[in-house]
């Protein structure tokens, strides 16, 4: 059973996926019901975080075995009382995997609420804390140090600074507020920094904020795979025509030994 509501897309994306999963060839091969089941299964999986957090090791600075040991020690500091393994990828020698634990369905929900935007919500599900720019609204009397329940406004309908929100929201877990409501919404200038320190997330995934920054790069698995498929060699010239914050360019440089 899905823990979160089914993901919703922009019209163009929905139309494309419908054509892919409900085309005549697929329905002929699988049958109408099986094709629909696969489509709904995709939507359910996309509503939840991946089963593993993937990190790429900077093999120029240290061995994978050494970084694996350091990372395990860092994760144990975050997850006191839990033994979360750090695994080596069976095919990609520079990748470490950390299993994501969840969803944790029995977390208590507190009266004080904090609503965050959808993008911030996605980051929280992947192990991030809540930073001030992601906060959309809070309950009326939230103070620094309060226990709060954090929710994502998945439809983008909550008004900034609202004291209550009865729209569609998804529970992300519990945290401790680092600031009061007035500090968040009545500041004379833009605020940065930590807003809510998550202590009981629905999905338990390590935070990589300042965790071994010179040794690790938090990177989604598909972005890693493409560099290995390319198999760049030292001395070659590589033109990256899709250079975005996915880490592919630096990975290519690492595989080429910066040559």
What are the functions of these language-model segments?
Residues 1-259:
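SAM-dependent transferase fold signal centered on methyltransferase-like domains
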